[in-house]
Amino acid sequence: MNKSQIRKKIFKIRKQASSKKFNLNSNFILSILKKERIKGKIIGGYYPYNFEINTLNLFKDLEKKNYRIMLPRINDKAQMNFFYWSTKDPLQVNKLGIPEPISNIKKYPNILLVPLVAFDKDLNRIGYGGGFYDRYISKIKVKKKIISIGLAYSFQKVKKIRTNKYDMRLDYVVTEKK
């Protein structure tokens, strides 16, 4: 299957599964952070959209442990940057219908929680097709160490994803099962 076919198949399954309660294990994510010995406590995340893994409880847990949360915002040049946000802060909806932070405090996160449509055993991912996360990870890795953690349902795992030179491999994938 090509990426477009995989997206179509997974979107359908993800929509059907959306009524079920899937919870991420925040302790597993914290164990990754300890293992990697990340110095800063700045986490780039995403606001759940289009039946993605719900990150809101995870953000609340991380804030209790003094992590700072950042969410992406897309600018007019189709570039993604991350801005501070707290679970108590309001959001604004962009032209794609995605909630974004209002803050103008931009920073590079140390850890990036990445939404995805599908992933494989080699930690390749398929996103929505805009290349936002691939470009962002590529840009940041030149400047500093960043750990990318894909968040997914276990049913989003596929056998093999054909990649191109612009696709950035994740460091980890966390599902509701592990």
Walk through the language-model features, giving the residues of each.
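Surface-exposed, charge/polar-rich loops and edge strands
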Residues: 1-5, 12, 107-112, 121-124, ...
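Short, well-ordered alpha-helical microsegments
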Residues: 52-55, 133, 158
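A residue-level signal for conserved active-site and pocket-lining positions in enzyme catalytic cores
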Residues: 10, 45, 69, 113, ...
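Charged helix-capping and loop-helix junction motifs
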Residues: 60, 128-134
